[in-house]
Amino acid sequence: MRRLTLILAIFASFTAAFAQKHITDSLMINGQMRTYTMFLPEGIQKDAPLVVFMHGYSKKKVKNFDRFGLDPVAAREKFAVCYIHGLPDSTNHYGYYVGYPPQASMQKHETSDICKITEAVQERYQLSKVNTFATGMSNGGDLCYLMAYEGQTTFRALAPVAGITLNWIFQKYEAPHPISIYEIHGTADKTSSWYGDMENKGGWGAYLPLKISIGYWVARNRCTNIEPTDTIPSKDPASTHYIVQHRFTGGTDGTEVWVDEVVGAPHTWHAKDMNTAEAIWAFFRRHLK
């Protein structure tokens, strides 16, 4: 009997580990093979929430998503994570089309493609078509803004990290509907400057200062409340960084705009200064329906 119990325990352990293993799959979208990696936690239910993640602009294919810390949160909260892999541009950097100069040769319907991938994932894994959210780092964060301006309806809320609004997007589009946005950004970011780069000194294309970028969404969402700012220290006792939390609430249909201003921090996911994945899920959880 003890032997049978041991065998069953080992089997259960194996099953749990397998259930939480990353699953990589592909599908054809607009003539291009798009690859994604799923994390489906053990015990996930039908119609569970889905968080879609887009990585940063990279010299090589991004394979290690563990450093973003979303999986442990998903395992506890029982939501799925879909990591969508970027495509190469003319310089063989992997990412998502947002209009960087090296991306001129890429197909220019990234919002539509990301939404189609997400909808296929919802169907394939029986996930919620309502409680679906998107987050991204750097290039992936920039894509969050492009998707918001283009009026996607697949995602209920967006959480760009180190994201920027390129000026061509700002000039071309008028966002057709409000959407909740949570930006996390370092003030010492030299890649995606907090202060913008309207002269295109960085080579990404001209982009807005973050205060203007965020101000657009505060106005578009018709937020009526500015909550008192809260300042919290970095979780790293040795760090001189600190986080100023800005909250604009009371928007149309409950929309809001959050900004975590990580003072002194560079271009990063900010996991050394705060529990970024936890913070993003806390924001998304507010918008579950």
Map each language-model feature to its residues.
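Short substrate-entry loop that stabilizes the transition state in hydrolases
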Residues: 44-92, 155, 167-168, 191-193, ...
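Accessory cap/linker subdomain of secreted extracellular hydrolases
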Residues: 187-230
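A domain-start/cap signature at the N-terminus of enzymes
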Residues: 17-50, 62-68, 76-80, 106-109, ...
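Flexible "cap/lid" loop of the alpha/beta hydrolase fold
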Residues: 164-181
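Short beta-strand/loop motif that positions the catalytic acidic residue
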Residues: 183-185
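Bacterial Sec-dependent N-terminal signal peptides
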Residues: 1-21
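Cap/lid segment of the alpha/beta-hydrolase catalytic domain
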Residues: 85-109
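Alpha/beta-hydrolase active-site loop
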Residues: 103-124
